[in-house]
Amino acid sequence: MAKIKVAIFTGNYNHIRDGVSLTLNRLVAFLLKNNVEVLIFAPTIDDPALEHMGTLIAVPSKKLPGRPEYRISTGFPEKQRRILEEFNPDIVHIATPDILGYKALKWAQKAEKPIVSSFHTHFSSYLKYYNIGFLEPILWKYLRWFYNHCEQVYVPSQSMADILKEHYIETDLKIWARGIDTELFHPSKRDESWRMKMGLRESDIVITYVSRLVWEKNPDLFADVVKRLQTKFKQVKALIVGDGPALSGLKEIFPEAVYTGFLKGEELAASYANSDIFFFPSDTETFGNVTLEAMASGLPCVVADATGSKSLVEHHKNGFLIPVERKDEFYNSLKTLIMDTDLRENMGASSLEKSKQYTWSAINSRLLEFYKEVLSK
């Protein structure tokens, strides 16, 4: 097969460091290494959060209302359209069904180019946090129309695929999971001096939350449950890793926690390895990158029984899956792990073993094969 040319359209490629931007940059790096030409179209800012991979073409955008750190495209002007036409992609990959994604879909239809899409954000689960849940039927109607015009849709987990099927998205759904660097994230990164630096003793039982700090990911639920545990177990400490708009509010309701701010690389790996339990009650994930990082670091995981983490955590094997509304069950599961050192270690070992199934090379190789499958039709 001749060299493949892929045009990728996304709402975030480098202006915010999150699971979407990191996943897409890893994909582009893999594609370039495997002799695939790639052109990316996305909103940009003057001071991006990460150094992007590949050739990025900026599109007009404005701040997203209510979430000004994110940007939303406002269109696909003639200048960018000419660049796309000159590139003449073999396949159009749309990562966000926003205005830019809609324009890309319409262009690809007119140009008779195959269209694929990847599902990164569980949009409908966010509506309740903004008190606009009444818009959910309209949103699903649009998503159904959008994805049913794609030849393939790549979802990060089977649980997410099941949800799309429930909403009558009938296109070819493929599992494109997320990978992990098992050399970076590993129990061997545990170091008592790191704990000391954070004001934590080796005898402490550290319960950790890692995420971009936004209320949609339920950091307040984490705070409520761990504060309750601390009234019973004096050795329990809370470690909160990340930054975001909810940080100041979280510090107000949970000043006792240790806050590291944003971490990456070896420091992020150390934060997991120096923890004892990972507690992540977010129910808005499509995959659960942080859960996988915790697993690779050998931690038992107490997570919300929702899309994303439920594809990674086996209840009573490497952690506990709890319906997000059952706060007492989160408390009791964490209490069990605090009191039972052997269970904590056994579940952590199971997490470590399961994480070995997820390597970026194998996962992105699978996506490249999906591209080739579409192009062979």
Residue ranges of predicted features:
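Short alpha-helical donor nucleotide-sugar binding micro-motif in glycosyltransferases
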Residues: 84, 262-263, 270-275
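Conserved donor-binding/catalytic core segment of Leloir-type glycosyltransferases
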Residues: 200-217, 222-227
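A short, well-ordered alpha-helix in the C-terminal region of glycosyltransferases
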Residues: 329, 336, 343-357, 369
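Short hydrophobic beta-strand element within catalytic cores of glycosyltransferases
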Residues: 300-303, 313
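N-terminal subdomain of nucleotide-sugar transferases
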Residues: 1-58, 360-362, 368
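Donor nucleotide-sugar binding/catalytic pocket of nucleotide-sugar-dependent glycosyltransferases
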Residues: 42, 58-60, 140-190
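Aromatic "clamp/platform" in nucleotide-sugar-dependent glycosyltransferases that forms part
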Residues: 264, 283
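Conserved acidic donor-binding segment of nucleotide-sugar-dependent glycosyltransferases
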Residues: 315-316, 320-327, 336-342
